[in-house]
A protein has these predicted regions:
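Mixed-charge (Asp/Glu-Lys/Arg
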Residues: 1-37, 42-150
Length: 150
């Protein structure tokens, strides 16, 4: 399978699994059309009538996620991260793990972990790079579905 198609299918897999989990929890989940920027799922809690936008990032056998922000864009991070994220990890045996993080939690995590990465001693200074979050940094958010509504 071509790499681009495989990556697209892995992304769709994560979105469908997240929508399914939301449905099991009694929430309404609707996948967006792919031309809707920075939102993969619209969510509704029928009990509270609260609505949310959700961004889903999925990897298979890769233990880090790019979050759509370059290092040079850090000053605009509050504008670029607009909603909660669900990070979906699919292992080599197709087991699924979910890491759910609110918008504010994600912004704090990005700033902390990126500072740690950026300030490491290096021979050459870093050029601009896409900011990524590692699976180990997301551990405390595993299966924390209520973070969607924070």
């Amino acid at each position: 399978m071509k790499k681009k198609i495989e990556k697209h299918l892995i992304g769709l897999t994560g979105e469908y699994f997240v929508a399914g989990m939301m449905s099991l929890k009694g929430w309404v989940a609707s996948l967006t059309l792919k031309n809707y920027p920075s939102v993969d799922i619209f969510g509704l809690d029928p009990e509270t009538e609260k609505t949310i936008n959700i961004q889903v990032k999925t990897t298979k056998n890769v233990k880090s996620y790019q979050v759509g922000v370059m290092r040079s864009q850090r000053p605009e991070i509050n504008d670029r991260i607009t909603c909660p994220f669900v990070f979906v990890y699919i292992d080599k045996d197709n087991n699924i793990e979910y890491y759910i993080i609110s918008r504010n939690q994600l912004i704090d995590l990005i700033l902390t972990t990126d500072d740690e990465y950026y300030n490491r001693p290096r021979k050459e200074p870093l050029k601009d790079y896409p900011i990524a979050i590692s699976l180990k940094d997301l551990a405390e958010f595993k299966d924390e579905w209520l973070n969607l509504w924070k």
